[in-house]
């Protein structure tokens, strides 16, 4: 899988016969299979298909965006004409989302003119021939009149199907997304260039390629998505096993997805060497579930799309045939009854708009023994709230940037967000409101609710938790009150995240609250600029000017400090963290912590010798790493290796049998007086997807966090999680003379749990706090000389009074009616202050005061010799 490309090319075969003196040369062309393309060959092939397209259809190539390394993300579109695309995007799609009942009536009356998009997609770029299948299908639909394939009916009888492409284009628009990961195609990688898996990121959306694809999916809302993967030898075609996510309207999609999968499987088998296929929902009891929106195919199901992951068996021409014909079999199924497909979609949207909770959807939600468990309502009469409110007011304990980011997130994902236009009960004007009476309420709820506890199941495929509010650190409240905000919602007008907006000019310093990732970014920016940054027990101390300079770029919360810090200042930190190595894929990948820390402004280095701090997240280290630098051990894999090495006497990392990938979000209790827990409250949360805890704490080590004694498990998949009560999850101490921090969870997993990043950054910055000394403000001058402008006679000095309220950040200039400029009287970066921690200072005199004196709180009017005259007060 990693090395086959090394053999591609022309190779000379030389045969000699010494007796006869004969030499025979033959050139052998090595290619993986007949329809194989390199990335560059694929780009050339799709351009050629466009150029050779039939004149009776519209064939386009669209660049959706750029990959992380700057490669184009290409998508082919085949439609009847431009009018078909325009009508779908401007009429059919928006009407379906907002007025599905009207479309249902027209559909029933046979008066509805519509076309449905179909998306053929690849996520994992090295799972060839996936990309080649899409490349070949694009050529077929662009340049051919008909396409014929063999298949069988339900009884196994052989038959031949011919699809007339112009006829298909009367009902469908075909989208060919050649690959989500062009970097991976060029470099022969399954993962993105940063080592992260795009097929776990469809809901997290931390990567640019994924965000681009998600935006495209929600632009088109295709009726079906065929996501070509490899390699499952049994030739796997979804739908998936239970547990199914309760936010689906699964009963509307289930039968259609099963029928579609059978049509695909029968066509794939009939045209290849393979003699069978499997459908996880029918053939496996668990372990290939659709409870997580991170998979591209499953993500589609949340939006009423027939989403299918297709796992071809091998990387060869036979799998090319199987995958290609499976997609053709799926298209044939769609073509048999498009009205039925559209009816399903419209009913899906209608349930959201009408806030319908149909019992039939609950009947699809089963437990491990097949029993119906339905939607967990926690004592309420219904599952879906009427609204979600995301507060946008300034709040020290709310990550304002992450709250603000949800505006773009929901827009990208087709969820409507409004803004509260007046205070209503505890909710404030300007708060974001998601009215759940909308087409995509299921996905909105999936992102904002706590999540489900699927610990009763014996197996799950990967992560389960999404829960953006808890995982990313912003507040969100479900509201069960129908009509509460009627007439009070409008379009979102806020253009940036909330942050401190007033600065006290008397405060020499500010404390940046350590309650957001933005705070860490801002602090690293200040350190990089050579500013003095001090550590305190609840944040970072910077001088007032530095704080003001950070506010335009960072959504941070600051408290005025009327003290003077003394002690060590923070320095730029270099971090070393060994890569992961995945034997099954034959690749290395960066530690997730490295990716996160780089975004937060830390420098990542390649050796421990270069580093200031070592972070161990994988098991790729030995005993020699310890005792040289402050070290962090993060997650179950690294903890198990630490115990195995035996270098930390008395340390015991524990897990349940088979539990190395158990996942859970839990309530925890921390030592909130320790600097390493800065920014977190005593009753907090803990997240892990590596199933470990600390059973024994070494002597002289301090316990920083433990799971709560009861009622602690919130969501995830952690069988027998009842054993976790009071278990230790974080400790600190020293090993071989260096600080050692051990954290059992995974605070940077796939870059999603932003709220937990600061467990890592706290340990990096350490616990050497500044001491605080009294601040002695400089004595104000007795007088301020204000020059008189626009005078024809000799001006005389005028005494002016200086008010000292809070000073707002710079505002726009105001202009009077006669167009004379009057500058808003605001604080400016660089306004001086005097600090006197060590010795008394002589008071400044009026002679040292500059003529450019910044006044605030009153208007200085200068026109035709008129002045406001005030006497200076001595404080």
Per-segment meaning from a language model:
Residues 96-258:
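Active-site/substrate-binding loop(s) of hydrolase catalytic cores
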Residues 71-78:
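A short loop-to-beta-strand scaffold at the N-terminal edge of the catalytic core in hydrolase folds
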Residues 779-855, 874-875:
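Intrinsically disordered, low-complexity repeat and linker tracts
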């Amino acid at each position: 899988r990693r090395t086959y490309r090394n053999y591609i090319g022309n190779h000379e075969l030389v045969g000699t016969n010494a007796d006869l003196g004969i030499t025979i040369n033959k050139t052998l062309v090595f290619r993986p299979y007949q329809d194989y393309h390199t990335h560059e060959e694929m780009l050339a092939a799709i351009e050629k298909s466009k150029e050779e397209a039939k004149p009776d259809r519209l064939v386009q190539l669209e660049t959706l965006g750029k990959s992380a390394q700057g490669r184009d993300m290409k998508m082919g579109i085949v439609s009847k004409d431009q009018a078909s695309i325009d009508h779908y995007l401007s009429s059919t799609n928006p009407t379906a989302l907002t007025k599905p009942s009207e479309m249902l009536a027209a559909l029933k009356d046979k008066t509805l003119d519509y076309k449905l998009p179909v998306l053929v997609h690849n996520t994992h770029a090295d799972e060839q021939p996936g990309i080649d299948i899409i490349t070949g299908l694009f050529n077929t639909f662009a340049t051919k009149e008909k396409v014929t394939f063999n298949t069988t009916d339900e009884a196994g009888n052989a038959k031949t199907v011919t699809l007339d492409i112009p006829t298909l284009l009367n009902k469908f628009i075909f989208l060919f997304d050649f690959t989500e990961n062009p970097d991976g195609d060029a470099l022969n990688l399954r993962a993105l260039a940063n080592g992260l898996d795009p097929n776990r990121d469809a809901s997290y959306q931390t990567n640019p390629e994924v965000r681009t694809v998600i935006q495209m999916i929600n632009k088109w809302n295709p009726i079906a998505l065929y996501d070509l993967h490899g390699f499952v030898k049994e030739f796997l075609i979804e739908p998936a096993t239970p547990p199914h996510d309760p936010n689906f309207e699964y009963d509307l999609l289930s039968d259609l997805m099963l029928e579609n999968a059978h049509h695909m499987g029968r066509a794939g088998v009939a045209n290849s060497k393979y003699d069978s296929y499997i459908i996880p929902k029918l053939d496996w009891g668990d372990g290939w579930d659709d409870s997580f929106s991170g998979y591209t195919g499953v993500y589609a199901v949340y939006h009423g799309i027939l989403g299918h992951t297709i796992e071809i068996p091998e990387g060869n021409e036979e799998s090319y045939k199987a995958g290609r014909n499976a997609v053709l079999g799926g298209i044939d199924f769609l073509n048999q009854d498009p009205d039925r497909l559209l009816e399903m979609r419209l009913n899906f949207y209608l349930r959201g708009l009408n806030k319908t909770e149909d019992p039939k959807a609950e009947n699809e939600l089963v437990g491990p023994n097949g029993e119906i468990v339905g939607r967990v309502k926690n004592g309420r009469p219904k599952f879906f709230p009427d609204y979600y409110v995301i507060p946008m007011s300034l709040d020290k304990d709310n990550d304002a940037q992450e709250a603000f980011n949800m505006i773009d997130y929901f827009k990208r994902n087709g969820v409507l967000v409004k803004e509260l236009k007046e205070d209503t009960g505890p909710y404030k004007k300007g708060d974001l409101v998601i009215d759940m009476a909308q087409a995509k309420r299921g996905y909105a709820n999936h992102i904002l609710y706590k999540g489900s506890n699927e610990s009763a199941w014996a197996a799950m495929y990967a992560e389960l938790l999404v829960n953006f509010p808890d995982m990313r650190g912003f507040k969100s409240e479900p509201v069960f009150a129908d009509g509460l905000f009627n007439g009070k919602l409008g379009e979102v007008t806020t253009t940036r995240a909330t942050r401190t907006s007033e600065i006290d000019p008397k405060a020499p310093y500010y404390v940046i609250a350590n309650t957001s990732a933005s705070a860490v970014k801002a602090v690293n920016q200040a350190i990089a600029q050579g500013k003095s940054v001090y550590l305190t027990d609840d944040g970072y101390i910077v001088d007032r000017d530095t704080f003001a300079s950070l506010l335009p770029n960072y959504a941070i919360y600051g408290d005025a400090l009327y003290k003077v810090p003394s002690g060590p200042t923070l320095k730029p930190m270099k971090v070393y963290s060994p890569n992961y190595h995945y034997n099954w894929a034959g690749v290395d990948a960066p530690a997730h912590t490295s990716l996160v820390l780089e975004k937060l402004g830390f420098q990542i280095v390649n050796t421990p010798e270069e580093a200031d701090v070592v972070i161990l997240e994988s098991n790729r280290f030995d005993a020699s790493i310890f005792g040289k630098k402050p070290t962090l051990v993060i997650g179950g894999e690294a903890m198990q290796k630490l115990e195995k090495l035996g270098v930390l006497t008395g340390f015991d990392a524990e897990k349940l049998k088979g539990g190395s990938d158990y996942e859970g979000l839990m309530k925890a209790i921390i030592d909130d007086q320790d600097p390493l827990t800065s920014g977190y409250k005593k009753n907090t949360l803990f997240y892990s997807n590596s199933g470990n805890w600390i059973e024994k704490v070494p002597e002289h080590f301090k316990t920083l966090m433990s799971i709560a004694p009861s009622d602690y498990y919130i969501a995830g998949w952690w069988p027998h999680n009842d054993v976790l009560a009071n278990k230790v999850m974080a400790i600190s101490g020293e090993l071989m003379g260096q600080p050692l921090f051990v954290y059992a969870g995974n605070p940077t997993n796939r870059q999603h749990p932003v709220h937990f990043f600061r467990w890592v950054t706290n340990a990096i910055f350490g616990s050497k706090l500044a001491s605080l000394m009294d601040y002695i403000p400089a004595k104000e001058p007795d007088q301020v000389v204000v020059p008189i402008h626009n005078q024809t006679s000799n001006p005389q000095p005028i005494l002016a009074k200086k008010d000292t309220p809070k000073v707002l950040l710079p505002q726009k200039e105001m202009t009077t009616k006669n167009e004379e400029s009057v500058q808003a009287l605001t604080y400016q970066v660089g306004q001086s202050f005097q600090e006197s921690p060590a010795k008394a200072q002589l008071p400044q005199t009026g002679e040292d005061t500059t003529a450019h004196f910044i006044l605030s709180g009153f208007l200085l009017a200068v026109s035709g010799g008129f002045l406001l005259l005030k006497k200076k007060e001595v404080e």
